[in-house]
Each structure stands twice: as structure tokens, then as C-alpha cells.
Amino acid sequence: MYNHKELAARIKTMICDNHIFRDIHFSRETLANELGISPARVSSIFQEEIGTSFYDFVNRQRTYHARRLLKSAVHKNDTLEDIALQSGFSNRMTMHRMSLKVYGITPGEERKIVKNKEKKQ
């Protein structure tokens, strides 16, 4: 059986490297089932080893991913709703709130900055 540090490393790999955060239905419970541990243990691992809550960590990963998509030429015609869904958010308003929390700007503002940079080139 894994100790908390080992489980934290495994969890980070599962979430970040495998991009399971992009699944809208991904939750603490689904992660717990995948690992064969209780949801309460998942929460304690996040608090003790990662230093944040499960949901804050997952939503930050979703926010980072959304920002990458917003800056990508491939996704420049995608709607903000599409970007939100592709990043694992259930709707664009949740992405909007998290983007403000993490970056201090909204996804719409981010998109305008990217478009202005493209025009200058």
C-alpha cells in the first residue's frame, strides 16, 4: 500500500499527465474509486501533501488547460463554452470565475489579448 507522499505523486501524475481533469464528470469520488481508497483519504492527501483541496487543484489544472487552448491558433474559432467543456468545466461561468481567481483576467479578456497580439504581427 502507498503512503501519502507516494499517493500524492501518483495522483498528480494521473490528473496532470493523463489529463483526466478534462472529463467533466471527474470527481473526488471517481479518483478514490480508481485508487481503491476513500474520498476522505483523497481529501486528506490533497490537504497534507499537495497543500490545497482536491477541487481547487483540479479546477486550476482546468484553468491552465483552458488558457493554453485560448492561446492556441488551432482553437481560435472555438467559443468560450467550447473551451470550457474541452477543459473539463461544466460551463463557461465556472471557467470565468477560476480564470479570474488564478490569472486575474477573464477568458474573454485573454482572448482579446491574443487577438491583439496576432494583429500586431
Predicted regions and their residues:
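HTH DNA-binding helix-turn interface
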Residues: 43-57, 99-109, 113
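Sequence-specific DNA-binding recognition helix
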Residues: 73-111
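Append "Primarily bacterial transcriptional regulators
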Residues: 27-37, 42, 46, 82-89, ...
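Basic, amphipathic alpha-helical hairpins
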Residues: 12-26, 46, 50, 67-78, ...
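Inter-domain helical "communication" segments and dimerization helices
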Residues: 1-23, 41-44, 68, 112-121
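N-terminal positioning helix adjacent to the helix-turn-helix/winged-helix DNA-binding module
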Residues: 3-11, 27, 50, 59-65
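Terminal helix-turn-helix DNA-binding modules in bacterial transcription factors
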Residues: 49-53, 57-86, 113-121
